[in-house]
A protein has these predicted regions:
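S-adenosylmethionine
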Residues: 1-130
């Protein structure tokens, strides 16, 4: 989808896509990091519909005991990787807005916007590193 949009908006020479685990980044000074980390907690993971459990790898779903393991990691590591005023866009679970905003603010981020998904649930936080 990202590559299609890159061509559609004719920005092939202005964007560099990097698809890698956040722990493996070696350089810093990025303008933008977009992350969709696993954010489902252990209890909710066991309650997921079979069609989700059977078609999605557990590693793509499980956010640890409280669902925030990878959210915390992405926020902390992004703080080191982003340049000043760089943007972090992160997807969250619909009940994770309050704690996610708290973690972001504790790590020096300004909250620009919280977007909702198609069912009206909080789903994505756009923030700026201060």
């Amino acid at each position: 989808v990202a590559k299609t949009n890159e061509k559609l908006h004719q920005v092939e020479n202005k964007i560099k896509f990097i698809n890698i685990d956040i722990d493996k980044y070696k350089s810093s000074n990025y303008d933008l990091i977009i992350s969709n980390p696993p954010y489902i907690n252990c209890i909710e993971l066991n309650r997921l519909d079979d069609d989700i459990k059977l078609h999605e790898p557990k590693i793509a779903l499980s956010g640890g005991f409280d669902g925030f393991r990878d959210i915390r990691k992405v926020i902390a590591v992004s703080k080191k990787l982003l340049k000043l005023n760089g943007k972090l866009i992160i997807e969250i679970g619909h009940k994770q807005k309050i704690l996610s905003v708290k973690i972001l603010k504790e790590n020096g981020y300004y909250i620009n916007k919280i977007s909702k998904d198609l069912s009206g649930k909080d789903r994505c936080i756009i923030s700026t590193k201060l």
